[in-house]
Amino acid sequence: MLPNTGRLAGCTVFITGASRGIGKAIALKAAKDGANIVIAAKTAQPHPKLLGTIYTAAEEIEAVGGKALPCIVDVRDEQQINAAVEKAIKQFGGIDILVNNASAISLTNTLDTPTKRLDLMMNVNTRGTYLASKACIPYLKKSKVAHILNISPPLNLNPIWFKQHCAYTIAKYGMSMYVLGMAEEFKGEIAVNALWPKTAIHTAAMDMLGGPGIESQCRKVDIIADAAYSIFQKPKSFTGNFVIDESILKEEGIENFDVYAIKPGHPLQPDFFLDEYPEAVSKKMESTGAVPEFKEEKPQPQPKPRSGAVEETFRIVKDSLSDDVVKATQAVYLFELSGEDGGTWFLDLKSKGGNVGYGEPSDQADVVMSMTTDDFVKMFSGKLKPTMAFMSGKLKIKGNMALAIKLEKLMNQMNARL
């Protein structure tokens, strides 16, 4: 892990959402240098499901050598933000670093996102980041350190990151767009950057999204804390960057990233919004090494008589196949289904016209997907998003992830018929 240098001693770091998770980890890292930490978060009373309050975080910060100022702050409330900033100035004399970490998430599509949830994400992620930045900037401009760090992703306009959770993506990208604007607006005065993880990070939010067992596919919050610490030590000229945690730590000379893993050696889930997503996943999966090519139809194994929702799903899939679908996909998929009506099924989108069936395909599969029969039917009917199923561990994938993503297009075509 990245060692502390003491360079943040005496600096005041204002962190939203610092009572737990990534925000608290960044706070503790800076506190080890002897920094002053303003814990700007909502949680003043213990939560039945989420550990930590602003006061327990303050105790941890002071235990490692920092000074803490816990402030009850809902970033949707401008008055609470301004009051916390005033308290920070009164107690510590200034603000040197702002970390916009507070965030709200809902991985739902447009029709499944209630207006109330949309407003929450926009007001916490996009508006809250703006309000906190606006309140701190007059004091940051007086600092020799002067950093704003948004925990937000690089701006990636690939539609795949929009189509299943459009509202969340736009809310997070709002945070990222402030980096573009404010980095230019305050160039030479304040360094403004974004930080995003390469892999899933184990937090309470990830536990709720991913369910039991997801932690083994995650890294610890320490990797984000170390990456943030690296950014804080850079000059004001380091601005307008969208930093990935692993990349900046490699620049710092870190080579062993197993120290950040919850379960060293276990395949890690890539995070959203990264261009290298398919490549990063495929490196952790078993690759068949197959090269797509158009083939004449070959004899396929005769399907074993089946009954139920899985067979009906494959019947509808087969009725929808065409040469155009085959040409656009060029892959053989194998489905290992557990539960009632389970077994091994295949979808051949390489042979002319395409084919489906029960058992092993005649050609080696490019992608192997393992899940329950219930989740399989839900995925093809649009009730379970493949990305969410994969991130939560309900869907296991071996092989070419880029080809796995192509299958989503076919699933979307099936939704109206299932």
Swiss-Prot record:
Its EC number is 1.-.-.-. The modification N6-(2-hydroxyisobutyryl)lysine is found at residue 42. The modification N6-acetyllysine is found at residue 116. The modification N6-succinyllysine is found at residue 318. The active site is at residue 168. Belongs to the short-chain dehydrogenases/reductases (SDR) family. Has apparently no steroid dehydrogenase activity. Controls bile acid (BA) and lipid metabolism in response to nutritional cues. This is Hydroxysteroid dehydrogenase-like protein 2. The lineage of its organism: Eukaryota, Metazoa, Chordata, Craniata, Vertebrata. The gene is HSDL2.
